[in-house]
């Protein structure tokens, strides 16, 4: 029994840590998962992160285990993943990994695809491995469904879904900066993030993304000038993704080179597109 699936990275429109409500959109960078199941009653699960053997496979093993436990099965399994998503950079690599592995396990089992169950098993696995502060329902849903999702992470509810303009390019900057997750500082900006969140609910996604990025970058001591530099070079919007250190900029074709040149001075730049199609078995 074998299953294969992929899920998407996501970029932040509103980080949910301050208010419990967030928004993200799917990016065309993927995690691919392959799961093999053996009906031997031994419940022995092994995993391998192919592109980074130094990373412990705890999350991917946990995703398979939680899925098999849900169906009351004691199969053994082997799971492997490979990724196009930079890890620990604010691009939802763990949400994407969880979604891909759980979906691949469903495929291997021949189970009917239940979107909400797959999302919840992935989130449970991230909580079990202490990889999330809020459950990251915004990231998880954008990674799974593609497009834009606006969510209440506490209630695990989707408040709104929309398509992201896929004629735009997304430039992702991975700067040489340390990650900093100071939850208390992020809670301080709650009332101001609420203003950005209302912009998102009203469909002003680019405005929301920029405001959110400035607020969280300030709270987490990341440079705020990077987003302004991107705008100066012609980006439509730009801001910190997740809790950083990545920044994302939305750019029309004619300004890609100018914005890329500007961002290059701060670190590595990746060019991708929005993805409105979401996760899939392949």
From Swiss-Prot:
The keyword Cell membrane does not apply. GO terms for molecular function: ATP binding; shikimate kinase activity. GO terms for cellular component: cytoplasm. It holds the Pfam family GHMP_kinases_C. Its main location: cytoplasm. Its EC number is 2.7.1.71. Keywords: Amino-acid biosynthesis, Aromatic amino acid biosynthesis, ATP-binding, Cytoplasm, Kinase, Nucleotide-binding, Transferase. One of its GO terms (biological process) is chorismate biosynthetic process. It catalyses: shikimate + ATP = 3-phosphoshikimate + ADP + H(+). It is found in: Cytoplasm. Pathway: Metabolic intermediate biosynthesis; chorismate biosynthesis; chorismate from D-erythrose 4-phosphate and phosphoenolpyruvate: step 5/7. ATP binds at residues 86-96. It comes from the Archaea. HAMAP family: Shik_kinase_arch. NCBIfam families: Shik_kin_archae. Belongs to the GHMP kinase family. Archaeal shikimate kinase subfamily. This is Shikimate kinase. It comes from Methanocaldococcus jannaschii (strain ATCC 43067 / DSM 2661 / JAL-1 / JCM 10045 / NBRC 100440) (Methanococcus jannaschii).
